[in-house]
Amino acid sequence: MTTSDVPSSSIPARGGAPRTLGSSVIAFTRQTWAGLRVLLALTVLLGIAYPLAVTGVGQLVFPWQANGSLLTADGSHVTSPAGNAHGPAIGSALIGQSFSGATWFHPRPSAAGTGYDTLASGGSNLGPTNPTLLATVQERRAQVAAEDGVDPSTVPPDAVTASASGLDPDISPAYAREQVARVAAARGLPVARVAALVDQHVRGRTLGVLGEPRVDVLALNLALTTMAP
């Protein structure tokens, strides 16, 4: 009898006894059940336990940061939009918002929606040689120079370009210092006092090497409201 004459169901499996249809189904069922158990275990561990643990640690160790880094009008840190006895939260130290008028330090431009739209975070996606971007930058440079009373060639880049998120809360120390004279004059404050306030709000590079020195616009403007002429 040749191999071709032997029924396929009785051909011995490599290294063992013949495998029947029933044994194949049992093996498949066992493998499937093992895979489902691994899936279930990882779902509970990584989809439920781990997020809850991280959330719990965040609430215990970094409650302010974990709840959005919210600030009230007097600069107090709160963990809820409802705020505290000093009033409701008016913004986040991590989210840029619009300030207009000569009495405030201005943030960098925003391309998020119609401007500072948290539901449409993003940049303009225009390349550095795009005519629309170049025209917009020139227009912004002229406007900022006129507002701050400086030469257009000295306007810092972040004063005329939007961030990748459109929600950058920070500006460069150079842009903050450029606005000092305007803000001081509008509020009737000595230039030296406003300049000192800016210096107090300059934060260095993260871990000493990451990013650039920066100034949080919301925190700076909140501190500005406490200064009397």
Can you describe what each PLM-predicted range is?
Residues 2-27, 34, 46-47, 54, ...:
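Flexible, solvent-exposed loop/hinge segments and secondary-structure transition points
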Residues 178-229:
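Extracytoplasmic/periplasmic C-terminal soluble domains
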